[in-house]
């Protein structure tokens, strides 16, 4: 049962543990908010379009950070935009995840030596998955999001909130 968390019994019932069911639900229901700052946002739109269709992975775009648990940062983060990004991140519900998309979001990119650029969004918010490229392709973003889904499913049960805790 460790290799396959869902087991089909002879009577047609699916037997699993609560942890495996919670992991599957969290993995397949990541609602994301786009934080498109530059040209990488165009590739993010391609990934959300009909050809790659992020909805089939359970990833639905939301406009409000209070409804999201995933932020995709795409593009050059400037010093002026950094406090706004942190404020939006703080408004997101727990557990929250961040995907850094593109060279500019990962480490400053082409504008690394500019006085007005933050050299990586991980200096402002904790990043879970980095997607390299300038700009990264839609396939690379989808692969990065699949890696995030794997990471969400493999979280330990100790880091999840307790549903039925004794007082």
Swiss-Prot record:
Keywords of the record: 4Fe-4S, Cell inner membrane, Cell membrane, Iron, Iron-sulfur, Membrane, Metal-binding, NAD, Quinone, Translocase, Transport, Ubiquinone
EC number from the UniProt entry: 7.1.1.-
Subcellular location: Cell inner membrane
GO CC term (a single one): plasma membrane
Keyword Translocase: yes
Membrane topology: Peripheral membrane protein
GO BP, sorted A to Z: aerobic respiration; electron transport coupled proton transport
Chief subcellular location: membrane
GO MF, one annotated term: quinone binding
Cofactor remark: Binds 1 [4Fe-4S] cluster.
InterPro entries, A to Z: NADH_UbQ_OxRdtase-like_20kDa, NADH_UQ_OxRdtase_20Kd_su
Described purpose of this protein according to its UniProt entry: NDH-1 shuttles electrons from NADH, via FMN and iron-sulfur (Fe-S) centers, to quinones in the respiratory chain. Couples the redox reaction to proton translocation (for every two electrons transferred, four hydrogen ions are translocated across the cytoplasmic membrane), and thus conserves the redox energy in a proton gradient.
NCBIfam families recorded: nuoB_fam, PRK06411.1
Family per similarity comment: Belongs to the complex I 20 kDa subunit family.
Quaternary state and interactors: NDH-1 is composed of 14 different subunits. Subunits NuoB, C, D, E, F, and G constitute the peripheral sector of the complex.
Protein name: NADH-quinone oxidoreductase subunit B 2
Species of provenance: Burkholderia mallei (strain ATCC 23344)
Gene that this polypeptide is encoded by: nuoB2
């Amino acid at each position: 049962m460790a290799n396959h968390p869902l087991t089909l019994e002879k009577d047609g019932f699916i037997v699993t543990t609560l942890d495996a069911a919670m992991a599957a639900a969290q993995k397949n229901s990541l609602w994301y908010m786009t934080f498109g700052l530059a040209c990488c946002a165009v590739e993010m739109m391609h990934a959300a379009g009909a050809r790659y269709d992020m909805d089939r992975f359970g990833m639905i775009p939301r406009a409000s950070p209070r409804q999201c648990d995933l932020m995709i940062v795409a593009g050059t983060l400037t010093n002026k935009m950094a406090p706004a990004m942190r404020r939006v991140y703080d408004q997101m519900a727990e557990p929250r995840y961040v995907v850094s998309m593109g060279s500019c979001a990962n480490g400053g990119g082409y504008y690394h030596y500019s006085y007005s650029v933050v050299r990586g969004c991980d200096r402002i918010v904790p990043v879970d998955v980095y997607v390299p490229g300038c700009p990264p392709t839609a396939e690379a973003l989808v692969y990065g999001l699949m890696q995030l889904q794997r990471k969400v499913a493999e979280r330990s049960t100790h880091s999840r909130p307790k549903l039925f805790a004794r007082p």
